[in-house]
């Protein structure tokens, strides 16, 4: 909307100052126009100098600039790449820091465009043919002041931001009368913001996780599913269609992140006491692949699940390595029923970690329903984490154009596995099952580990006898907590996280002290090394208090942050749904309070 500006409303001194500035601007513009005119006249002079006159006689071969005769063998001249004229060696100008050259006219024409800024207007005219010439506010004021005292000034329009396509098109029609560079910028900003909102909704739908179930017909299973946080729900068909676009937008630059310290590819050699099942196996790790990322997002085909798979499990305490020997499969379904074709391979995960670092897979066996792999897949995992992990062994078909087809899976809770039993290391046959939408609620979920250091700082002694009598010494305590880092977190599909830590100390009077660490972006194993300090607490208060630490993944485009895991210390220790961790957290909290002014290192399991 235009605003009316009346110069007569200003005082005489103010009006003189405004006009003086405008006239000075007009003087600068006239000086600039004179400089541009001289540059163009010099360029025109060079062109006239090289033009041939009808009153003079020229040889057949001569320089197009200085009209000097050119020889047949020596001083033959060369053709300019800009104007395609043959010029002599003296009429060439070499460009700075390059071996390329131009003739004097082409070089001067290039300089004129650079010094006058014509290259910008040429590029703008080429990209935006309908854009008009830019007019400055000073020129408009001077022209209108000479005619009328009232001036109409149009302020710059803020960038539009609308939800629906209809409102976006109407906004573009309102901006149609504006000319110049502002129109192109606003159109570009509108398209970018609209696309970003669509991309954020689709990407957030892709990150919804589906927890899988251990296939045991004698056990009762629960139902828990993490819902998407977008405004509208999408079906499986639209999810499959939007996945390649999202991967193309978010994986143009391959993120560089350190390998997972819990799950490593390079493991020490296994113990010689292994059974013969593991002696002949080959270790085969997997790399980051977009196709595996798509399968975790649900972008795959399903076949009629049939058949069985034979594998064995062994854990080496000395090297802290879990070994899965994939033997063979039988009676698999066809990955491509029409072509009667099946190219199977096996892929494993240690749930809940579905990242690319936690993936292991075998080689692909071509054209067989009864493949034999004889490969050993290894994980580097601590013994304390085995009770909270589930082994997922799935069989896939590699189709045309790297299309994956799901052939079946087996999920085994490692908490129920007896690694000390020698008979448990023998290879067993397991029936393949279809993908389930549920998971067992009675199995504690391990979402990684959080390394912290804690210290209770208490004064050495009271400075005055009155302080000890009044109890001021007990209230001057300080709880210091250093969040070192985390590992084995449930990362995104690209293998990275934008993680941060929140801390909440709940005192006996229900007062809550909250702190937060900075965000570390694009790191799978973040190392914050950030200090949390809680002042004005006593040892007696902390014995009845609870410290809760939560790790979060910062969302993009203003969506809700994703909770990665939590750990509790104190009188009400233990994460929700994991009662076994309560006694351990209370013991660690007691160690901190019983050793004041000393650092205590702890590794907290996130649930």
From Swiss-Prot:
The RabBD domain, residue ranges: 4-123
Looking up PANTHER family in the UniProt record yields: BITESIZE, ISOFORM I
* A single GO molecular function term of this UniProt record: zinc ion binding
Task: Name the major location.
Answer: membrane
Q: How does it sit in the membrane?
A: Peripheral membrane protein
Instruction: Output the PROSITE patterns linked to this UniProt entry.
Output: C2, RABBD
Keywords from UniProt, A to Z, are: Membrane, Repeat
Protein name, entry field: Synaptotagmin-like protein 3
